[in-house]
Amino acid sequence: MSEATTGTGRVAYVLKGYPRLSEVFITSEIYRVERLGVPLRLYVIKAADEDVHHDVVRRVRTQPEYLLQPTSLTRARLPRWLAQNRGMFLPAVVRTGRRHPVGLARAAGQALAQSVRARRKFWAFPRKLYVLELLRAVDLADRLDRAGDVARLHAHFAHGTTTVTWLASTITGLPFSFTGHAKDIYTEELNPAGLLRRKMDAASFVVTCTEANRRHLASLGSRTPVHVLYHGLNADFEP
């Protein structure tokens, strides 16, 4: 039986970018979780793009693993983009399809349904963003399978990163949780057509940083527990 099955494996953090000066609070959290003896893996969606880092970064022992970096989809036509990037994703799709055929089919169905729900107008094309997030989830699932020691996933920020994590959880069967912070839980465009509620329903728990945020998340109607972990200054911090 694998470590992931027995629940004694690693926690995989899924982040949009790492390390980031604007998100030192996340790096500090990772450092503190390591200090508690929790084994981690770090999976990062976007390539590192900052040269200056906070000092806490060097204290984190777990090294980040960056997901595949496709070309921009923002202004590209989806068929052309898929043709340009299929060679990058195809090996992971094949491996994941062999290991998790049902999970991959379910995740593809979730992504397709969301792409249709999130159309800006009834007659508009489905939102292509969710194709990209599905492929990123397949890449993540493939890496989790190869690692073989992850027991659960945790994402920071409740929009794109959590969508990728939710889909990867659907594929692999690993439980996931996420932390919601600010605009990622309040801005409808970032989680259109009820997406945030669906991700909450699928998660084992949700974390946020203020009581106002907790009340807002609770108002969405999900029964998933929402925990508050306040930001603060640790006056006893030792370098």
Predicted stretch roles:
Residues 212, 232:
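Carbohydrate-associated surface elements
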Residues 201-211, 227:
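A short beta-strand/loop micro-motif in the catalytic core of glycosyltransferases
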Residues 73-76, 188-190, 218, 233-239:
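Acidic anion/phosphate-binding donor-loop and adjacent secondary structure
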Residues 81-82, 97, 103, 128-129, ...:
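Short N-terminal targeting/anchoring amphipathic segment
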Residues 47-133:
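Conserved N-terminal ligand/cofactor-binding loop architecture of enzyme catalytic domains
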Residues 1-81, 145-148, 174, 201, ...:
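N-terminal subdomain of nucleotide-sugar transferases
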Residues 176-204:
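A conserved, positively charged/aromatic
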Residues 16, 45, 158, 180-183, ...:
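Histidine-centered beta-alpha loop that forms part of the nucleotide-sugar donor binding/catalytic region
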